[in-house]
Structure formats: C-alpha cells, structure tokens
C-alpha cells in the first residue's frame, strides 16, 4: 500500500483513501498509474477476486477474457455470446472499476433481476476497489452497500430489472444479466427471465 503523507481515510479504513489523502510517490508508482490508466490489461493485474479454495488472490485472465476486455475498451456497444460460468460478470466488474477510476463523472449501473444479485456483484467491485493499491484509485466520497461515489465524480449504483429501472438517470455504462423469453408449453404463458434461471425450470 502506498504510504499516505496525510492520515485521511474514509471512515478510518486504510483501503479507502479520502479525497484529500496525499501519497509519497515513487517512480514505480507513477509508471504503474500511467500504464493502468492507458491499459485495462495492466490495471487487471491489480484486480483481486475471491477464489473458493484459496481466498483472495489477483485474477489470472484467460486469453478470451483479455479479448473481451479489449473489445469493451475499443467499442461502445458489445454483445458477448458465451457459455455460462466463464467469468463474464468478473470481466464486467474489471471494466466498470477501471472506468470509474480513470474517467471523470462516469456512471455505471449494475442491473440484476433481484436486488440481492446486484448487491452480490457490487460486493465484488467493492472488494476489488479495496484491494487496489491506494495510489491507483480516486478518493471515496460515499461508500455504501448499494453504491459508490468517488472524488472524480464517477459512481456505481445498482438496480433491479423493473419497468422503471434507472428511469430519468444519465448512465454511461449499464451491465446486467442476459434475459430470455420462454413460453410455457402447458399454459402458453410467456415468461422473461435471466438465462441462468432457465436451467432451473427445465
């Protein structure tokens, strides 16, 4: 962790620098900051996940995950056709965290069918933010269970997939689960649900 020359941290948490926290910089820190700002792949080297067997550890990206990250940074709109459980949500959390750290006034909205799911995804981002070296992240203005606001004006919030989700809000990046339409053969009723829930009813 970078040594702060002023002991100012959000709620006393040493992993949450306040906007006025200053650091004693060295050449390696300056180089890492610049490289992380320019390259999401370099930034991802500092991104931590929780491995079920080994606990907290830096993520090790597969080549296809690197390609997705590059596509996210190179293109405004992206559609990813992929199987389940290959780390798509993790990739989106890396992208969201990178953007709010290095873009001013950038707004991310995490959408899921249930609030608990959105909160769980946001917990991953909170963990990754806390595990970043302090010199890589803007200071914290607000740090809550359902949202994060940084000193550079960027923020992340959560929402459920309701008909009026985020209505009237200005959002730069929206991430969410894939939703499919399924017709019940017996009743004829049409259901909309996340892909991950389809397997549960088959």
Residues of each region from the PLM?
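Phosphate/NTP-binding elements of NTP-utilizing enzymes
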Residues: 2-176, 182-201
């Amino acid at each position: 962790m970078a040594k702060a020359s002023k002991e100012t941290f959000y709620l006393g948490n040493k992993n949450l620098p306040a906007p006025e926290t200053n650091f004693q910089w060295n050449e390696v820190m300056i180089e890492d900051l610049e490289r992380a700002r320019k390259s999401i792949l370099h930034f991802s080297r500092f991104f931590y996940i929780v491995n079920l067997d080994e606990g907290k550890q830096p993520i090790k990206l597969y080549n296809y995950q690197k390609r997705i990250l590059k596509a996210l940074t190179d293109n405004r709109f992206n559609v990813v056709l992929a199987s389940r459980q290959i780390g798509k949500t993790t990739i989106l959390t890396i992208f969201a965290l990178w953007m709010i750290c290095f873009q001013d006034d950038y707004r991310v909205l995490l959408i899921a069918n249930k609030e608990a799911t959105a909160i769980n995804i946001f917990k991953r981002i909170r963990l990754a933010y806390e595990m970043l070296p302090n010199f890589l992240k803007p200071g914290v203005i607000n740090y809550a269970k359902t949202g994060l606001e940084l000193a550079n004006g960027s923020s992340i919030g959560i929402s459920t997939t309701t008909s009026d989700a985020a209505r009237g809000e200005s959002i730069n990046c929206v991430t969410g689960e894939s939703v499919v339409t399924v017709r019940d053969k017996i009743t004829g009723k049409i259901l909309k649900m996340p892909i991950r829930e389809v397997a549960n009813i088959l």
